[in-house]
């Protein structure tokens, strides 16, 4: 076991805050319409250029263990904001740094950290209520486009394409993003489906940055029962390996030896594979698997009809252009099912809806109908170079997530204005002691930081702008950093999803509270000299089954 380095009190917190400052300084430059780009060296290929706060945060690891602990805590705030709301990562970073740094000064001055935290929690909950009150539902395509434009750093085309995609497949519809083979940026609606089952093992992940498994042009095996032993599947697995195409297995479950064997072969590169549980339960599960079979032009392997895994050939497997599997969902894009068969299945489901008397059954049938007939909108992002395409694709994905958040919880005035005006409600809060009051005042000051940073990135004085905005009673009155003018933010179309604002504040306060209440820090002591990794021999040939290992 490695020896540990232990630090206590203000020294530990101060070093953690140095790490927080390093990460926050790199991330904060991306905030707002005039935020700057950050260039990140990649382990291979061209450097990555991004204006996405969470991408910058994820790329940072510090050599000093204690500083790195602080940086990783701050990174967790940005990552959580991105996961929950898809945007607000830079705002979360700026807020967390302000709360942690000023909070630590108060602790050093003798304030009780637990009472400071209580004051902060009360203030944050009050601001969240103010954000909820200020929130306004969005309905029009124009408003959806505005959210997409803001979240993609002012790219109007991205906002308009997202709005068009939502119009095509509905606000709850499935929308995916992929790289185009040319310069254009298009929306295409294809046959596809999403269901709420994720990968059975994280070892199936192919894109570790986004933690998703991406299978291009895969075969799809649909098996009605549980898979616990792969022996009956060896002939079909061998055929898939020979074809050099990936395989998606959808079954009631894949467990024990079968799952372990698939994982081993996936890691060794013998078989590009992923496995997910089938959606639904009981008879409904079988019906949904039959829907997937029709959508992908495959067969549901069911023993009730005398079908056995040993006899399955490639002809029985479904096909799709692409499958993307996250921790919670599977999206099948452009299944190769026959249009006529899909239409017949849709009519069959519609007749079941008309016949059923159960509200529950009707709801579940309507869900199946929507999945089968709704299709998938694909946003195809093009550009002149690979670097440009990847950077724009990142922005499209962020904007899409933020737009979904806006549809879910509504929008508020953007540009940091909502948090700034909400902070004024904190001045009337009554608390038990001066330490809790200091916690409230800490939040009031920190809520000025996002708008200050937006303004400073645009080359103006943030403090002056904040002072002017606070003189106004209108809560939508703000500063348009793009045109350098004071405007009504809602009328000007400068809006943020309420969910993004809420999540950024919650995650920032959570991380800052952890830092100011930390008294002891334990990390691995750095080694005097690094031991070189022993050279490994080649993997050697994996006998049998074309490189597979069973």
UniProtKB/Swiss-Prot annotation:
It holds the Pfam family Cpn60_TCP1. One of its GO terms (cellular component) is cytoplasm. ATP binds at residues 30-33, 51, 87-91, 415, 496. It is found in: Cytoplasm. It catalyses: ATP + H2O + a folded polypeptide = ADP + phosphate + an unfolded polypeptide. It comes from the Bacteria. Keywords: ATP-binding, Chaperone, Cytoplasm, Isomerase, Nucleotide-binding. Gene3D superfamilies: GroEL, GroEL-like equatorial domain, TCP-1-like chaperonin intermediate domain. One of its GO terms (molecular function) is ATP-dependent protein folding chaperone. Its main location: cytoplasm. Its EC number is 5.6.1.7. One of its GO terms (biological process) is protein refolding. It is an enzyme of class 5 (isomerase). Belongs to the chaperonin (HSP60) family. NCBIfam families: GroEL, PRK00013.1, PRK12849.1, PRK12850.1, PRK12851.1. Forms a cylinder of 14 subunits composed of two heptameric rings stacked back-to-back. Interacts with the co-chaperonin GroES. Together with its co-chaperonin GroES, plays an essential role in assisting protein folding. The GroEL-GroES system forms a nano-cage that allows encapsulation of the non-native substrate proteins and provides a physical environment optimized to promote and accelerate protein folding. This is Chaperonin GroEL. It comes from Rickettsia bellii (strain OSU 85-389). The gene is groEL.
